[in-house]
């Protein structure tokens, strides 16, 4: 009995505090800076910006190691498969655009067309740019080489500048002398054929460039796209001149516009790629 009474005396200190309900955290006694993160979860916009920042840092890290982003996207056999496709498209582009360049030069000389001359120069540029892409992907071990990629882009930028100067000078000369283009079936045939073929080549190069994350292939595709636009512009200016001889300046004006577009793209390409060539010059092991 004394033991029971003693246990009763020990268990009488005051009412017991009920435990917190299950599933609920204990209430904080005082609000402070430590409790603010729990009440303010990160916003979706902040999470998206964080992911973008991490992706950019990851790409920069790849470039610092001399690799393109395609090295993490493609398996080795997939990369080699797309490399071979890029080579085939480049060879096909060289053959087609070389034939179109000869035809366009013929039209330019015989029909006094500034747009035809501009297209012929752009076709020669397309041949050279496709040859550079061939060099870019000629080495199977350098399919992901950032240094090789940037060198190809710098060469393309220089070619763009030289070609644009020739196109603009020829177009301005034709405008100043008021040369009137002659219209015939041969001019129509060349313009339609060049417009269709160059547009198809541009789509193929853009697709391969996106998969291989290749700025050189995308630049080559841009050049083919310009060739397609110039081909259709020959058709447009000739058709307009046929119905209204007062609009004789349309042909030369299109030539000037396309020349300036190529010049701007070339300058942008050099500004972007020259520093990157210097940054990756230590990775010539891929050559």
Swiss-Prot record:
It is found in: Cytoplasmic vesicle, Secretory vesicle, Synaptic vesicle membrane; Early endosome membrane; Late endosome membrane; Lysosome membrane. Zinc ion transporter that mediates zinc efflux and plays a crucial role in intracellular zinc homeostasis. Binds the divalent cations Zn(2+), Ni(2+), and to a minor extent Cu(2+). Is a functional modulator of P2X purinoceptors, including P2RX1, P2RX3, P2RX4 and P2RX7. Plays a role in central nervous system development and is required for myelination, and survival and proliferation of oligodendrocytes. It is a multi-pass membrane protein. Belongs to the TMEM163 family. It comes from Bos taurus. Keywords: Cell membrane, Cytoplasmic vesicle, Endosome, Lysosome, Membrane, Phosphoprotein, Synapse, Transmembrane, Transmembrane helix, Transport, Zinc. The gene is TMEM163. Homodimer. Interacts with MCOLN1/TRPML1. Interacts with SLC30A1, SLC30A2, SLC30A3 and SLC30A4. Residues 40-70 are annotated as: Required for interaction with MCOLN1. The chain crosses the membrane at residues 87-107, 115-135, 149-169, 186-206, 216-236, 254-274. PANTHER family: TRANSMEMBRANE PROTEIN 163. Coiled coil: none annotated. This is Transmembrane protein 163. It catalyses: Zn(2+)(in) = Zn(2+)(out). It comes from the Eukaryota. One of its GO terms (molecular function) is zinc ion binding. Signal peptide: none annotated. InterPro entries: Cation_efflux_TMD_sf, Tmem163.
């Amino acid at each position: 009995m004394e033991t029971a009474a003693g246990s009763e005396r020990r268990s009488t200190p005051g009412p017991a505090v009920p435990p917190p309900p299950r599933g609920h955290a204990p209430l904080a006694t005082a609000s402070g800076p430590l409790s603010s993160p729990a009440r303010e979860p990160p916003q979706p916009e902040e999470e998206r910006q964080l992911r973008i920042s991490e992706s950019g840092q990851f790409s920069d890290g790849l470039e610092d190691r001399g690799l393109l982003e395609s090295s993490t996207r493609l398996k080795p056999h997939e990369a080699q498969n797309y490399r071979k496709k890029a080579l085939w498209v480049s060879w096909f582009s060289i053959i087609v655009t070389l034939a179109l360049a000869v035809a366009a030069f013929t039209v330019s000389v015989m029909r006094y067309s500034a747009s035809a001359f501009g297209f012929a120069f752009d076709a020669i540029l397309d041949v050279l740019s496709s040859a550079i892409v061939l060099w870019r992907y000629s080495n199977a071990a350098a399919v992901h080489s950032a240094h090789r990629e940037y060198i190809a882009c710098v060469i393309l930028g220089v070619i763009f500048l030289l070609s644009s100067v020739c196109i603009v000078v020829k177009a301005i000369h034709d405008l100043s002398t008021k040369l009137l283009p002659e219209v015939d079936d041969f001019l129509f045939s060349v313009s339609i054929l060049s417009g269709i073929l160059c547009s198809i080549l541009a789509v193929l190069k853009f697709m391969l460039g996106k998969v291989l994350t290749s700025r050189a292939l995308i630049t080559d595709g841009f050049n083919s796209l310009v060739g397609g636009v110039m081909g259709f512009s020959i058709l447009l200016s000739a058709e307009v001149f046929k119905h209204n001889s007062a609009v004789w300046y349309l042909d030369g004006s299109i030539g000037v516009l396309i020349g300036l577009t190529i010049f701007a793209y070339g300058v942008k390409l050099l500004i972007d790629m020259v520093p990157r060539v210097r940054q990756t010059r230590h990775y010539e092991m891929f050559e």
